Each structure stands twice: as C-alpha cells, then as structure tokens.
C-alpha cells in the first residue's frame, strides 16, 4: 500500500518523491483498491494495494530519460533544499542552473513542490544546453 501511495502521490504530498516523478513520467498510476491481510496466506502485517498503470502517449514521455533520471536524483538527494541551492552545489551546476532558469521555475522552490512536468522541462532544457553548449 505504501509503495502505491508513493507511486500515485502528487507535489506537496508527503509520499511524493523521486519514485513518483519517475513513474509518472511514463504512466498514470492509480490505486484501484486496498486488499486486506486476510486475502493472503500467511497474512502479512500490512495492507496491500492493487495498482493500475495507464501508459502515457509517446509524445508525453521524456525525450532523454537518462537526463531526467539524473535531474530527479540530484534534486531529491537534497529534497529539503531550494532548487537554486541544489544547483549551485551540484557538479552539474553550469547547465542545471541555466535549465531551471530557462524552464521558468522559481529557484526558491523545493523538489517536492515541482510537478512531473517541471522536472521534464528542466531535463528538456538541460538536453538543449548540453546539445548546444555555445548557446549557454
């Protein structure tokens, strides 16, 4: 059940994190229903959940999953810090700071406040900066 909550959580929810952003970049997860311990033998000490995943259309999925994974990892390693601070302390700072700015995201926000689309915008702008370094 807890994993299902993490997968389906949105920004601002205590369960929202790197796993939420990654999964929701490729599919729409939904908790269908809770299954009590009595449905299993031996019964576990926790409730379980049945989840469904609706794949996103290809044009809504990340163009550079490798870069998205890197942005998510860097941001959620310091989830209580502001994005501007994370970018300044990160070895990727030259392009990460610029990508955050170009994506129009406020650098005083924290990772758990960003939407999945925000993370995708950052990685998309990061890809364009890396592919065209002279435009920096």
Name what the model sees in each region.
Residues 1-111, 121-136:
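Class I S-adenosyl-L-methionine
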């Amino acid at each position: 059940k807890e994993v299902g909550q993490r997968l389906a959580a949105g920004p601002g929810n205590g369960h929202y994190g790197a796993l939420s952003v990654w999964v929701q970049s490729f599919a729409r997860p939904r908790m269908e229903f809770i299954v009590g311990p009595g449905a299993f033998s031996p019964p576990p000490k926790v409730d379980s959940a049945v989840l469904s995943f609706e794949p996103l259309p290809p044009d809504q999925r990340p163009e550079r999953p490798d870069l998205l994974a890197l942005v998510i990892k860097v941001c959620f390693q310091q989830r209580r810090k502001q994005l501007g601070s994370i970018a300044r302390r990160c070895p990727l700072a030259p392009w990460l700071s610029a990508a955050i700015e170009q994506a129009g995201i406020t650098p005083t926000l924290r990772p758990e406040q960003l939407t999945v689309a925000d993370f995708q915008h950052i990685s998309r702008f990061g890809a364009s900066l890396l592919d065209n370094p002279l435009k920096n």
